[in-house]
Every structure is written in C-alpha cells, then in structure tokens.
Swiss-Prot record:
This is Type 3 secretion system regulator YopR. Keywords: Plasmid, Secreted, Virulence. It comes from Yersinia enterocolitica. Transmembrane segments: none annotated. Residues 131-149 are annotated as: 3' secretion signal.
Amino acid sequence: MTVTLNRGSITSLMSSSQAVSTLQPAASELKTQLEHKLKSESAEKTREVLWQQYYASNPPDHAVLEVLATPVREALLARFGQHQGPVVPAIDLPELRSVLQQFDSFGKRREAILLQVLEGIKPNESQVGLPYLSELINKELMILLPYNSIVDSLLHNSHQIDMET
C-alpha cells in the first residue's frame, strides 16, 4: 500500500491540524458551559421536586421549605447583608426581584420563601445589614401578598357571576 501526497493534500492536512488546535479551546469551553447548564438544570429539577413535595404534604413540610429557602437566604445575605440606611424601593426592589427570579418565578413560591427567610433572620438582627434586609423583604411582601391574593381570587372565583353591578 503506497500513499502519495501532493502539495495540496499536505496543505489541507496542515490546515486541518491547525483547525483542530484552534478548535480545542472552543470545544473545552463549550464542554464547560454544557456541564454548567446540566448542573443548573439538575438544580432546577431538584428544586421543582422539592416544591412538589412541599405542596403534596399536608400540612406543608417546613423542613422542605427550609431546604428551599437556604440558598435564597445565602444569596440575599451576600447581596444585601452589608447595606445600611433606608431602603430605596426604586433601586433595591428590582435587585431583590432579580435575585429571587434566579430561584423561582412564581409569586406564591416567592411569598413562601421570603416569609421563611424573614423568619430566619428576625432572631439574628444583631448583624449590620439584617435590619436593612428585613425592611426590604417587608416592602416586597407588601406588594407580593396583595398581588398573589388578587391572582388567587381571579383563578378561584372567575367562574362566578358578579350580581352586584
């Protein structure tokens, strides 16, 4: 078996090896991104299973809620734990909502998590930023609780005709 190489095949062979060497960093970066996505999807699936377990238990299991609230509490303490002074709702509430959006997008879940986080930080208000975080969570709950009540009312009572008007 003889192999004949001409100038064109050597050039194409060299360019393909160069292409492989330039593609290897991109492939490893893509692999890293894929692994990160799989881990985050796994975390999302785990959170979803925990939420289903929480809602399926009667009465709701507070140990499961504590497991769900722990990463949110840590993220909120990392983000707002050192703040002092008054809460500026126009700036602080969107930041709080963006942190909460990373964990859960449903209002009822956010409500449960925020109440659990608030319960967990109330006894330990000796730290610097905890009164600030507590006030920020209270301001968000003042918006979230009525909003969730309105949505719940619309979902459960929309089939009934309003005879008063």
